[in-house]
């Protein structure tokens, strides 16, 4: 199913696609939400269609979200778009035979950044308040973050021009300014377990490696999949070249991690119940 409107305005920027295995038309399935990349200024959900289809074949209901792009809006408006989609998903998930108790989310590049911050906002009210965003939370158990554009204000080609378009010209004077740093404890400690993916040829590899160190400093549950030097394995290769053997490995490993987190969460709930 494609181009389902998740907002009342019926804008092309407020639509989502749904993928499910052909051999499981009505079976309740675990859910993966996907947010496409493009540096928050480019891209569309169609770029990720083969990635989503391949993930769906592993037995998931995959929901791919479109959202507005900078400079037509600010980063905070993009967060509002994602939360509007979350609200629609929560209200309609049973219609699509999705299991809300087994829900995960993935994003690549700018989409990984957007996903990270939206999940932080829904789990940490201080971040949402500083952004002046109203979350519509979903019980996301784990994140898959591929070649994440986590940092937006470094002294590099991204940080030199993008922040004013993302956050507004005077963002450094706002309450949100401390949260532009994704290593802020309010961000890190609000996230569910994370599966990080990068590669030696990923031009944003240093972003993932720095973010991984921040997770490690806070003893946050995570896994890093870092591929060695290979000319084929560039930025977000598992999304743009989803049929590579390494892409298959990435998608399968991410799925395995999600299932591992789900099992450990369920086991913990059973142990808690038994202790009462």
Listing of model-derived features with the role each one plays in the protein:
Residues 1-276:
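Alpha/beta-hydrolase superfamily serine-hydrolase fold, recognizing
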């Amino acid at each position: 199913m494609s181009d389902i409107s998740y907002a009342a305005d019926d804008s092309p920027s407020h639509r989502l696609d749904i993928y499910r295995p052909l051999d499981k038309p009505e079976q309740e399935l675990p859910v993966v939400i996907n947010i496409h990349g493009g540096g928050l200024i480019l891209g569309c959900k169609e770029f990720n269609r083969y990635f989503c289809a391949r993930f769906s074949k592993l037995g998931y209901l995959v929901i791919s979200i479109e959202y507005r792009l900078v400079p037509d809006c600010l980063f905070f408006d993009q967060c509002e778009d994602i939360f509007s989609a979350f609200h629609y998903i929560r209200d309609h998930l049973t219609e699509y035979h999705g299991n809300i108790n087994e829900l995960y989310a993935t994003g690549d590049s700018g989409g990984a950044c957007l996903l990270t911050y939206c999940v932080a906002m829904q789990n940490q009210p201080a971040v949402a308040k500083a952004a002046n965003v109203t979350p519509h939370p979903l019980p996301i158990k784990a994140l898959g973050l591929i070649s994440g554009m986590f940092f937006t204000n470094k002294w590099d080609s991204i940080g030199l021009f993008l922040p004013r378009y993302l956050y507004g010209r005077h963002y450094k004077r706002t309450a949100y300014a401390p949260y532009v740093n994704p290593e802020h404890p309010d961000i890190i400690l609000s996230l569910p377990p994370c599966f990080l993916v990068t590669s030696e040829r990923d031009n944003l590899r240093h972003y993932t490696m720095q973010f991984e160190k921040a997770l490690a400093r806070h003893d946050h549950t995570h896994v890093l999949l870092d591929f060695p030097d290979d000319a084929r394995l560039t930025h977000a290769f598992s999304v743009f070249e989803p049929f590579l053997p390494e892409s298959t490995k990435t998608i399968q490993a991410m799925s395995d991690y999600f299932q591992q987190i789900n099992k450990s969460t369920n086991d913990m709930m059973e142990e808690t119940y038994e202790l009462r």
